[in-house]
Each structure stands twice: as C-alpha cells, then as structure tokens.
Amino acid sequence: MNWDTPIDLAAAGSPSALSHQSLRDNIELVEQLLRQVAAQEGGGDLVELLDRLWASHQDRTGEGLALIRELSLEKSVLAIRAFSIYFQLINIVEQHHERKRLRLQASFSADTAQPGSFCWLFDEMKSLGVSTPEIERVLQQLDVRLVFTAHPTEIVRRTIRTKHRRIVHLLDDLDNALSEWQQQQVHTTMLEEIRIWWRTDELHQVRPTVLDEVAHTVHYFEEVLFEAMPRVRSELVRCLDMFHPSLTRSLGTFCRFGSWVGSDRDGNPSVNALVTWKTACHQRSRVLAKYIKSVERLRDLLSLAEGNPPQDLLLALEQDQRDLGEVYERYSVVYLQEPYRLKLSYILERLEHTRERNAWLEVHGPQRLSQPDEPGWLHYYRHAHELLAELHLLRQCLRTTGIGCRPLETLIDQVEVFGFHLAGLDVRQDSTRHEDTLTEVSAKLRLTATPYAELDEQARLEWLVRELQTLRPLIPAELPFSARTEETIQTFRMIRRLQKEFGSEICHTYIISMSKQASDLLEVLLLAEEAGLFDPATGTGTLMVVPLFETVEDLRNAPHVLEQLFSLPLYRCYLTCHQNLQEVMLGYSDSNKDSGFLSSSWEIFLAQQHIQQVARRHGVQLRIFHGRGGTVGRGGGPSYQAILAQPDGTVSGRIKITEQGEVLASKYSLFELAAFNIETVTAAVIQASVLPTSPPGSRNWELRLQELSDVARRTYRQLVYEQEGFIDFFCHVTPIDEISQLQISSRPSRREGRRDLASLRAIPWVFSWTQSRFLLQAWYGLGTALDGFIRCNRERNLAELRSMYRQWPFFRTLISKVEMTLAKVDLQVAANYVQELLPKEHEHTGECIFALIAAELERTRECVLAITEHRQLLEDNPPLQRSIALRNATIAPLGYLQATLLKYLRYENRQPRSYSRNELLRGALLTINGIAAGMRNTG
C-alpha cells in the first residue's frame, strides 16, 4: 500500500473478512517481534530508550530532543536502526493487507466493485448511457505504456527488498495457519528473519553499476509482471463479457512496458553503447528463460494422444522434421502418438537456439559482425511473431478438437506483451550532445562556413533539411572525433544493430531532454539517417524522435516547436513512418524546480491543450508521455485521479507514463498490487477517453488558474532564485551533501558536477526537502496566490474556488495533493534543522527565510481548508489522516537524530565527544534510510 493511497477498510465491503482488527493484529505482531530483536541485539535499555523517544514525540515535549542530544553515537545508531526497520515492517504489513483486500474485492459483484476497476468503470459508463460503439472506438486504439526508470534515490538495497518479500510470504503463511503450533512456527521464523535483517547492513557499500540496476528492474518483470499482465487482460475480457460481450474481438495488446534502465544516458556517463547493448541482451535472456519454462510445462500438460491430428499440425511437424532432424530423432519415438508434445519439443529447441545466439551476441557486443563470424544456428527465432505463429497454431488445433488450454492462452498473452525484448528501451540524451556532435563533425569536414553552434535557428533548420536530403553520407565509417562525439555516433549505430538483431521493438524511441527548438529534433533525425534508422528518400524509418519539454519556458514554447516541425514536408515524411503519430514528453520534475508546484502543474496542463490543438490542426496523432515522479513535487500521486485530471481530448486512448524506481516496490512487488495498478491506469485511460474531464464553462476557471499560477510562480522564484542566501540555507538545513554520498545510483546527483541550483537534479532537490520535513517543492507559492485572490472579494472568490474544487477534476486533484502534502509537513522538526545546522554567520538570513516559509505554510493551510471546507486537513479521509499523524509522530525522532548527527558531522567543534567522520556519516546515512521508509518516498 502506498501512503498516498491508503487502505480504505470500509471499501472492502466485508466487515468480517477484512476488519481493522486483522491489520491491527499484524502490526502488533511485528512490533512485538521487533521489540524482542531490539532487546536481544541492544539490551533492555535500548527498548526503554525507544519507548521514551516514542512517547516524548507523541506529545511533542522537549524531553525527546534533550534525550537525543545526550545519546552516544552507538546508541543513536541502534535507535535509528530500530525506527528504520519498524517503518519498513509497517509498510510490509499495510501492503500485505491491501493485497488481501484486493483478493477479496475480486470476488465481489459490480455493485461492490472497487472504484477504478474495470467492473466498476463499465457499470458506471452503462449508467451514464455510454454506447457500445463509443467504447469500441477507444478499445481499438487503447495504448497504455508504462516505462520503468532507475531512480537516483532508490534507497533500499535489493538484499533488504528480498527480506521484505520473505516477510510478506510469512504473513501469507500466518493467514493460512490452522493451529496454534503452525502460528508459533511462523512467529519463530519471522523473528529469525527480523534478527538477521537487524544484522544486515542497510547501506549500499558500493555504488551500483548500470547493469546492477538493470538486473534489479528486470526482477519486477520476472517475478510479478510476467504473470500479472495475463490476469489484467483476462479481467478486462471478463468485464467486457459482462457489459459489452461483442467487444472482446476489439481488444488487441493494450498495455506495453518500457524501460530507461541501461538506456538513459542523460547526465549518466556510465551508460554507453555497450551497456545498452548488454541491457537488451540481458532482458532477452530473462524473457527467453521464462518462455522455455512455460513451454516445458505445456509439454508436460498437453499429453493428448492423437492418432489423426489436424492437418495443419501435421504439415508443421513435417517441416520441423526437415529443419530440426536431431529433435525428431530424439523425440519421435517417445512422442509417437503425442503430436502436441512433439511440436512443443521443436519449439523448445528453437528457443534454446535463440538463447544461445543471444548469449553469443552479449559477449561479442554491438560492433558490425562479418559474415564468417556469425554463429551457425539456422533455426532460431528471429522475431517473437514466429513463436506466436506456432503457439496460435497449437491453439487453433486444440480448439478444433474441443480442448481449451489456459496455460497456452497465458503464454500467448505474455509473448504478445513482452515479445523477445521484455521492455522497449527508450534512449534519452540531452539536446546539447547532438548540437556538439554536429558542430564537431561539420567543422572537421568543413561543411559550414560558420560553426554550427553559432548558427541561428533558421540557419540551422535550413542546413539540417539540406543535409537530410543529401544522398552522400555525412559521417565517415571511421570516427576521427572526440570521445564524446564518437560515443554519440556509436549510440545511433548500436540502435540500428539492435533493431536489426532484435526487432525495432527493443529500441524504438529516442528522447531529447531539454528540447527547446525544432532543430533539436532534426539534429537527431540527421544522426539517425546516418545510422540507417531513417531514409527520407524512401519514407522509411524505425526510430521515433521524442522531444522532452521540461522548463516552464520550454513548455510554453512547445506548441511553436511542433508547429514548425509539422509544417516541414521532410518532417511529415518522417511521421508517415510512424503512422502519423507524434510522441511528446512533458517533464514534471524540472518544471517544478523551475517554477513551483502550481505553476508546473498548470503549465503542463496548458501545454497539453495547445500541443493537441497544433496536432489536430495538422492531422497528426498525438501520444503524450508524462514524466511523473513518485512524489507530489514531481507530479506523483494516485495515477487514476491524475489521468482523469488531464485536459479533454488529450488522452484519446493513448498514454505513456514513467514509473520511477522508488515506487516500483510499492506498486509492483506483489502480484495483486501490480495487476490492480495496471488495471486502474488502463481504466482511467478508457474513462478519460470516453467521458469529459472538464465541466462546461470551465474556460473562465482556466483564466483564473493562469492568474493564480503567475502569482505562485513569482512567489516561488522570489524565494528560491532571488532571495539572498537561499542556496546556502538549502545546503545547510537539508542533507543534500550527505545524500550525494549514498551509494544508491549509477547516476551523479548533479549535472556535470557543478554546485549550483541549475545543475542540481530535481530528484535530490525533492529528496532533501522531504528529509528535513519542509516538502517545500510541493506547496510553496500556492498560499500567496490563493490568499491574494480570496482577499479581493472573499465571499465571491472563495465560492468560485469551492465550485472549481467540486466540479473540475484538475483543480480538485491539485488541491487534494497539496492537502496531503501539508499534512506531512512537520515545521517543528524543520525548525530544529535550522536551529542545529545554520552556521552563526548565516543565522540572521536563515531565520528570515524560515519565517517566510512558515508564513507561506500557514497561508497555504488556511486557504486549502477554506476551499475544501474542512476543519482539519484530510478530514474527508480518516484512514489517511490517522496514518500520516501516526507516522509524523514516529518519524520525528529520526529527524532530530539526523539533525544532531549532521551537526556533529559538519561542525567538529560542536561534537560532545570525539567521533570519526566515517562513523558520523554512517549514522547520518542510516537516518536518511529510516526517514525515507517512514515517509514512503524519497525524490
């Protein structure tokens, strides 16, 4: 369960099966077990210390802070470990409870279906009179894409994640225990597991490599998604059969997966052509291993003795015998009367050949292979479609004999979704890399009188179009260029080699981060043409070029950029290679860091509207790629509500969303949670494509939002970019420097290693404010905007805001996110960071900045309460309200411990006794882990 989407016990509809008591019992159990472990590992005085710390922070007395200041480093670390494991255990119990609820919900009728489920959606649309043809139209173009990323603040070690899964399985065992003895056995095993966990280092000892991150991400596909996707499809088919039985024929492959892990090179020098090649080979090896196991199980199952098998199967077996005679010799006698088993043996052999070839390719890399070096396997699968054709043949032959086979249907579903690639790799690179590459190439070959980088935009466009239409190659086979330029060129050549060997699905998308102008896309098209990925002469191309607009200025300019591109005949030729579809990515993180939460949210909303208008005017299909993070400050929050809050007409059955590494465990670590997450995202896309998301007459509200956004942006930038001493304040009162020392990501936390706000990545920016409990990025500026508007005419303007909140999904979602964030802010803890960590020379400036933040927080809180008509934050969601209140009180000791350890670490003269820097750093890093577990998010 994600803290942002709490368990609603009442929603389960069964007061007996899933009561508060079952959740409470498991929480009490893990608390008791942790107390036992703490006593065993730290003695009775540690348990007493933990009780005192917890009690003192429930009522917010000063005793807790005084106690922390007296603790030795050794005792501090023990307390930190206990609180950190406690939060992780609570998270596990809540996640387990949510899984039980979803299992129970699956057995209910449409009357009690979970909101956001397929059953609930189709029942709702039936009551609203939505016609079958309208739903069919959406289903025919339904295209949901979920893209996994490696998160620079994915703080939990894979070793610890494995322990989490084991404890979940033990909770399952406890549910199934029938006797006291069985329950006691589970308790004993769980106690042992927690004790081993206590002695396991929670900190990464070495920075993970990119391929380590690849293996970590692929785990979710292997262990969960491979089985979850067929379940989601079968649930959609089941619900369509209930409400629109004729539409199951309209259902294609509606959900696919992508990944940036191993292919996102923006700001990560560790990702190069060879790494991306190895990533593709690793993904293929894992998906082939899954298929081989599935086919082996099918061969065990399909023991049908057929003296007269279907003619199509006989013809296929005769061809197989000619191609793979050794398989026939091995199995023809054993499976003499079992043609399905014999056919599956041929399929297994081809899969094994495919796997062997893949292993060979992984070793030899992406360089162009000469013919004599090619492996001698003739009978491997060149594409997943070949395997699918054989599986479809088996299904058809079985149907002619009146036999159905669910495992075969499941395997077909899996091959249709995951192919031989598992997840498509999106390559991402900063726009300046392509500019630098063409500048160097054109200078080396003397193609421009003026250096390319010095050309204005119009001159660039003219030169790029001319070069794209020139038949001669631009770049020589041998690369006499700098290492950076050579790597950029090799990336495109590697993509071409990947597509040739694996099919275009493996690497079909090239994202240009920090896109600002039309030439940014044409530069990539030119480099793609040089690698054989685009040919304007024949109108063929296999690489989709995707601009990523990130700052507010770039979001505002995006419609103009697309207008320019769509007006170019050469670019329209490129679009025909992709069924006239343009994908556009919008960045939530950098726009938020640039302009604050309200302005970022609103500018992304506007950009979608204006981009859609440009696309419609030019007859271009549009797919918007939402670069959402895991936290509110980076566009996070419940996906269902977020999709329904998009502007009318911008979804149209298609959406692409990033799933950040930090939320993968909460969404995809358990089968039921993964299946339901995919189901709700898909249901939301269907709903947003069929039903209007903006109320009639909302145009005036959009004008109002623009006014509020402008004020909020000015207020935010006055603090973050214009307030004297703010950067020093940020560096002092957050653990930003210590976060950069966590060995948790292959990617640096800053671009190019600079130490200014512009170079700091949005993710550690959010992570730092979350740790010190300000959560500044998710609300600052909103209060001034709302308060100023309300004060102009309180009765009229507040009534307007309340109407917007009740009737406009976008505004309601925005305010709800802020309300939840405000509940998480703990200004008392934040004030302690200021008190403990500001140097004397910064005290006056820092106190002024803190006063600005505190005043804005109070303004924001009062305005949100007035708009929602709540007396307290989250008054309409008691489970979430209670959960956050409890977590706030329990996280507080970790915040005080962190500030104290940071003080000792940074200021040697403030240490009560002499500690080594490494000891203090380790303690501080452990608090970062603990707070992240308690807050349930990082960046």
Curated annotation (Swiss-Prot):
Catalyzed reaction equations: oxaloacetate + phosphate = phosphoenolpyruvate + hydrogencarbonate
Disulfide bonding pattern of the chain: none
One protein family per Pfam: PEPcase
GO molecular function: magnesium ion binding; phosphoenolpyruvate carboxylase activity
InterPro entries: PEP_COase (IPR021135), PEP_COase_bac/pln-type (IPR022805), PEP_COase_Lys_AS (IPR018129), PEPCASE_His_AS (IPR033129), Pyrv/PenolPyrv_kinase-like_dom (IPR015813)
Cellular component GO terms held in the UniProt record: cytosol
Domain of life, source organism: Bacteria
Biological role: Forms oxaloacetate, a four-carbon dicarboxylic acid source for the tricarboxylic acid cycle.
Protein family membership: Belongs to the PEPCase type 1 family.
NCBIfam families the record matches: PRK00009.1
HAMAP family: PEPcase_type1 (MF_00595)
Name by which UniProt lists this protein: Phosphoenolpyruvate carboxylase
Organism per entry: Gloeobacter violaceus (strain ATCC 29082 / PCC 7421)
